[in-house]
Amino acid sequence: MEFENIISAADKARILAEALPYIRRFSGSVAVIKYGGNAMTEPALKEGFARDVVLLKLVGIHPVIVHGGGPQINAMLEKVGKKGEFVQGMRVTDKETMDIVEMVLGGHVNKEIVSMINTYGGHAVGVSGRDDHFIKAKKLLVDTPEQNSVDIGQVGTVESIDTGLVKGLIERGCIPVVAPVGVGEKGEAFNINADLVAGKLAEELNAEKLLMMTNIAGVMDKTGNLLTKLTPKRIDGLIADGTLYGGMLPKIASAVEAAVNGVKATHIIDGRLPNALLLEIFTDAGIGSMILGRGEDA
């Protein structure tokens, strides 16, 4: 056996030994994963994500995927000559845009994720929040520095989640893949930020972990240093001084709310890293930023 292969084998053995306590600890638990960013668009990362999700299921963890689809929605809007607009990180969604959002998220994106997971041996099932009306939504009004309660169209916030559908899929050995579209009291569709859906679903499922995949290493301070542990108080300060803004705001808000409301560990991790999920769940060091419901920052 060549020397490099001996090293490779030794590394693999070490990794497995390090992972074993975590496999035992988390077996039988739910991990809600917000899937987005480069991990959804780069072929190698997409395939790696699917393999990692299947592995989680094989070792007894129950992954529940909530996906975004911003780049795909933008591409479709561009095709039809419609410009995307955002307010405080939320997509302005008129009726035409909502039709496109629902088509892209519930159709193309959801089915692609399901197909890829199943290709690697999983049993994924795609659902939208409108299926069985399991995600009830209400209109979201956004406050801006210039104006309070701005109406940005068919954009919603989660009013309630009936977890029966998702729990039923888990009990059947399936991997639920959730498109973040909710339903209003009149049956109308609402575009809901995927981070908000993931956080609320993690709360309602009493998840062990909420993992949010992003295109950054985690939460950074103004000098570019990674903040590995954060409390709500520290996060309030980072928002106040402008360190956190735009699209990070709903992600952070969802992570904090989930941590405060009982999700045992909430993480913002770098989805550009191969095997990011496994690195966070099964290694001593972990990656990214952990959001704590209470306690001291590290």
Curated annotation (Swiss-Prot):
Residues with site note (Transition state stabilizer): 34, 251
Gene3D superfamilies for this protein: Acetylglutamate kinase-like
Pathway: Amino-acid biosynthesis; L-arginine biosynthesis; N(2)-acetyl-L-ornithine from L-glutamate: step 2/4
Its EC number(s): 2.7.2.8
CDD domains in UniProt: AAK_NAGK-C
Disulphide bond pairs: none
Signal peptide: none
Keywords tagged on the record: Amino-acid biosynthesis, Arginine biosynthesis, ATP-binding, Cytoplasm, Kinase, Nucleotide-binding, Transferase
Reaction catalysed by this enzyme: N-acetyl-L-glutamate + ATP = N-acetyl-L-glutamyl 5-phosphate + ADP
Keyword Aminoacyl-tRNA synthetase: no
Record carries keyword Kinase: yes
GO BP terms in the entry: arginine biosynthetic process via ornithine; L-arginine biosynthetic process
GO molecular function: acetylglutamate kinase activity; ATP binding
Major location category of this protein: cytoplasm
Record: residues binding substrate: 69-70, 91, 191
Pfam families xref list: AA_kinase
Subcellular localization, as worded in the UniProt entry: Cytoplasm
UniProt function note: Catalyzes the ATP-dependent phosphorylation of N-acetyl-L-glutamate.
PANTHER family: N-ACETYLGLUTAMATE SYNTHASE, N-ACETYLGLUTAMATE SYNTHASE, MITOCHONDRIAL
Similarity annotation: Belongs to the acetylglutamate kinase family. ArgB subfamily.
The name this protein goes by in its record: Acetylglutamate kinase
Species, as recorded: Neisseria gonorrhoeae (strain ATCC 700825 / FA 1090)
Gene: argB
